[in-house]
Amino acid sequence: MEAVKLYEQLEKDFINPSLSDEWAVYMESVFDFISDNFKKRSMGLVCDNSQEINKVYTAVFPSNGVMRSILDKNETDIMLFVHHPSIWDIRKAPGVWQQMDTGLLKQFKERRISVYNLHVPLDNYGEYSTSVNLAKALGLEIKKPFAPYFGALCGVFGKTRFSTVQELKEKFESVVGHKTSLYQNGVDEIKDKTVAVIAGGGNSIDMLEGVAREGVSAFITGIAVQNDHSKKAHDYAKENKINILGGTHYSTEKFACMAMCQYFKKLGLSVEFIDDEPVLEDM
């Protein structure tokens, strides 16, 4: 497929003028590899290295492991689709966002491997969005979106068949494939069997206010660790008796990147999701 036609289709299907983002201000160290358009608006085509796209790989972050696994395949004229153009690692706070390795980016350019990013557009409520696909994986019946974020609505409310937070936690762990955290600030019973979901980093007062307004007592997100940055959010959750379940940034957002495989298949492209490692310290 002509690369420009693929980029145009992604633009049409996901990006609209109401959405914004700010990645470029943190990415000066890799500016030599970044497209001018991405420097201006922080979404869409990150690295313009291909005229043809024969295969797409999807991933949550462009980690060294993900980039190397693609290079090890010895393929050319392909695209890496990522939810983030940088790599999250809370263990390296305050510099939690690490940039792509320049040596690997040079090899991407030589191999004609482009990089494409949808962050806010993929967080935005829709068929392929992060929270929608996490909610689906949890077996929730999605009711409505919430949580304004850079022009998007990044969260969803859904109905669960489970009656207690403990049951929901067990389901959450089976879905993400590892232990999850629970900050139990209210009763174990899930009020009205309604759950709020924000994949990734929903542990902030702005997001929790939307949960509290609906009277919801169970909230699932990715980054839930209690630290200096999140103390006010945890205090707010305690005051409003909101139980917070955390499953890591990576594990809660991977379902959207897996769902995007179906999107690219519909365009007639060969596609593969590349799994990565969750940072358990997120919880």
Residues of each region from the PLM?
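Active-site catalytic microenvironments in core metabolic enzymes, especially phosphate/sugar-handling
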Residues: 1-283
